[in-house]
Amino acid sequence: MINISFPDGSVKQFEKNITAFEIAVVISTSLAKAAMIAEINGDLKDLSTQIDNDCRLRILTAKDPECLEVIRHDAAHLTAEAVKELFPETQVTIGPAIENGYYYDFARDKPFTTDDLAVIEAKMHELAKKNEKVTRELWDREKAVEFFKSIGEHYKAEIIASIPSNEPISLYRQGNFIDLCRGPHAPSTGFVKHFKLMKVAGAYWRGDSRNEVLQRIYGTAWATKEQLESYLFMLEEAEKRDHRKLGKELDLFHFQEEAQGMVFWHDKGWSVYNTIEQYIRRKIRKNGYIEVKTPVLVDKSLWELSGHWEKFRDDMFALETDDKTLALKPMNCPCHVQIFKQGIKSYRDLPLRMSEFGLCHRNEASGALHGLMRVRSLVQDDAHIFCAEEQITDETVSFCKLLTEVYKDFGFTDIKVKFSDRPEVRAGSSETWDKAENALKEAVEKAGYSYTLNPGEGAFYGPKLEFVLTDAIGRQWQCGTLQMDFVLPERLDASYVAASGEKKRPVMLHRAILGSLERFIGILIEEYAGRFPLWLAPVQVAIATITSDLNDYALEVQKALIESGVRVDINISPDKINYKIREFSNQKVPMIAVIGKQEKENKQVTIRRLGTTEQEVLSIEQLIEYIREENSKYI
């Protein structure tokens, strides 16, 4: 007999070699009917897995989050089965689950069309309704290679031949379809109910541009109909909010082939950029930071000392001049250490909080570039805090509070924290890591945050915190970071004189709140759907006249607003007032100042706010004072 421990703490005895599914039947027939996979000692397994030793067991259903990836993997196999039935000449390759869905790569001479996707999806529903049994089989390697070659699946044969000889060849069969896979999978195709094929794209075999191009079908799959509909609605909303689309419509920025990954900021976009920089500058000054500016182009010798040349050389832009190799900096930290090293530093100088809006360059692959979200030239709201070990907790708490304030001002209140602790390969002693991790954990808790642990995901030089924002349509964006570093001060010989008179290495805290300004602006455009709040809007007030005889007064209002620092646009053309209002509304201007005969006589304007039909009559002075008050909260 073997002892099986269950999540409720109970322990029951069963005969050896019983399957997880058979145990589910013993527990209840309803559980057995809903069961998808089993978790045995923390590992996900098929329900058909035989258990011959004592273990911890969970029977998982579609309600358990662990099953979502299984559903998506099952959907990938279902897609491949449908394609093979409809287009038997097609070869299958790989089909993993990914975030929010899955994909499957196919080799086929004729490209899949939108109509093909609809037919494939219909076939998938047909196969799912058949509720075909899914079974796992272990094959001999040579037999598996020969089998897949014999049915014309040369890509599968190549994959199997490349699997290490000590690994079993695991195949899954459903209906007439068989695929190479580690699993686990649900016991039948009927568990895949809520899915949709999304698009077709090209993909290189094995991700190598020297290889042939395959056709990648992307799909999404969910546990419930409501989840699928919610996701599709989010995608629809995201398309409307796409920062690339809105950037063009609102005349904020553009990209072009001659400068891939580099932003051409237009006047309005540059206004948003500068306002954010001004806002951050005000915040960091209030929090005791100094601001510096370091070179963009630095000799490779510094990058060799810091270790960046070895690790990031392929992502750096370099050039040869005067028998030297110079590189555009991909990050600011080594340069900040150079400033710290100027002059003798004492413990009284710590903590030293050094910030920079640092212009960095990274040689991203052209295929990875994505509007403002992934660029080659970027500015970070970067800072490095040089401190003593005993100051780590307080500095981290202060940073968390500052970060919370900033995110709140931009409208983000749902913030999640990920804590990445020591990796297997790391610098520094276990004692040093213990201190660092405990200091970060204590600080995060003091700042009022809970966190999820990313075991082993810290950098080799120290643990880190990642701050993740949730936007208006439920997407998550990792923006802020705090990274502890024991190594760089050592490598670049940074030191301070302790109270005892001995020379010590400072701890270096790398921290950013927004990350790259370019990416954060992209996030904001999508968060606000282009409707920037008044303090941030590139045009705060648009002036529109009802008739041309009011133009002189409109220009007078414009002059007064500009002199008061208000960002203004004006339309004194002969166009009708409704057209002017509509045009300014399409440009997402938060306040439209309408000027008619009565407004001119009373030295007033009638304010219409974006998205409402309400109107408010204000004097010029009242309007200026209102905008000043709004601005003063942020900049």
UniProtKB/Swiss-Prot annotation:
Record text on cofactor binding: Binds 1 zinc ion per subunit.
GO cellular component, one term: cytoplasm
Gene Ontology terms: biological process: threonyl-tRNA aminoacylation
Quaternary structure note: Homodimer.
UniProt function note: Catalyzes the attachment of threonine to tRNA(Thr) in a two-step reaction: L-threonine is first activated by ATP to form Thr-AMP and then transferred to the acceptor end of tRNA(Thr). Also edits incorrectly charged L-seryl-tRNA(Thr).
Sequence ranges assigned to domain TGS in this UniProt record: 1-61
Protein name, as recorded: Threonine--tRNA ligase
Enzyme class, first EC level, given as a word: ligase
Molecular function, one GO term: tRNA binding
Family of the protein in this entry: Belongs to the class-II aminoacyl-tRNA synthetase family.
Originating gene: thrS
Top-level taxon in the UniProt lineage: Bacteria
Residues at which Zn(2+) binds: 333, 384, 510
Catalytic: region residues: 242-533
Cofactor entry: Zn(2+)
